[in-house]
Design a protein with these regions (language model features):
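Short N-terminal edge-element motif at the start of the domain
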Residues: 77-109, 120, 134
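Acidic, small-residue rich beta-repeat scaffolds with periodic aromatic anchors
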Residues: 9-65, 162-236
Length: 236
């Protein structure tokens, strides 16, 4: 657990629906200002072994999961679970058979992997798992996504020189075609794992985007935030 002591930026704000806002664009614009650019981003073309910068990486498929070897150290995904809820309230088993992408952050001594299952069918094609690997401590942190994108990103939200990760939880579509996605802040610990970033009062930091199917109707959009700073500066 990571504790933020004496934080003065906590805001709980729900938008006013009297005026239209494209909250998806507001979120994207905000996140772009906080992104940490990777030293290298590699999209795997099917290879099982490759060298990226000075790092040697290989992987193989197992009966349940994959085994990744990073500079001689083995990382086995079998039996691992996500830190975040992926769909609704439950964590997910890391069910993968393919290494899709590698992101290297040299200054942060981190690697980020996007892991998938191929060939996929139905809802399984909307799922991916993300592994953060600390090159110094060899610690692993797992997250999952469903219908919330395949991109891997690290951020600097707190100006504390500790990289952050933003988990995404999809809460499903209601009868009116309205979706809810919750974003939760995780930050790197001194041990190399990523854990929820919390206030001195043990409150986590999050924001929710509530939107209609395919973002077609802005009248149904809402944005709720309890974050370290105000994201929706329009105030509506």
């Amino acid at each position: 657990m990571i504790i933020l002591v004496g934080c003065s930026f906590v805001t709980t704000q729900e938008t006013n629906q009297s005026q239209r806002n494209d909250y998806s664009q507001i979120i994207d614009n905000y996140l772009r200002t906080k992104m940490i650019e990777p030293t290298l981003r590699f999209n795997n073309d099917g290879r099982k072994e490759f060298q990226l910068l000075q790092h040697k990486i290989s992987w193989k498929e197992l009966e349940k999961g994959i085994d990744i070897t990073i500079d001689g150290n083995s990382v086995n995904t079998c039996g691992k679970q996500t830190s975040n809820a992926v769909w609704g309230s439950g964590v997910d088993n890391v069910n993968v058979n393919y290494l899709q992408q590698v992101n290297i952050y040299e200054d942060e001594c981190l690697m980020g992997f996007v892991l998938t299952y191929i060939p996929c069918t139905g809802l399984g094609c909307s799922v991916n798992y993300q592994l953060i690997y600390d090159l110094k401590t060899k610690q692993e942190s797992y997250f999952g996504r469903f219908r919330t994108g395949f991109e891997f990103e690290l951020y600097n939200f707190n100006s504390d020189k500790k990289p952050d990760y933003l988990s995404k939880t999809f809460y499903g579509r209601d009868a009116l075609g309205v979706d809810t996605t919750e974003f939760v802040l995780y930050s790197k610990t001194e041990h190399g794992t990523f854990e929820e970033f919390k206030s001195a009062n043990q409150e986590r930091y999050w924001f929710k985007h509530i939107y209609s199917e395919l973002h077609a109707d802005l009248n149904n959009e809402r944005f709720i935030e309890k974050w370290i700073e105000i994201i929706n500066k329009n105030g509506r």
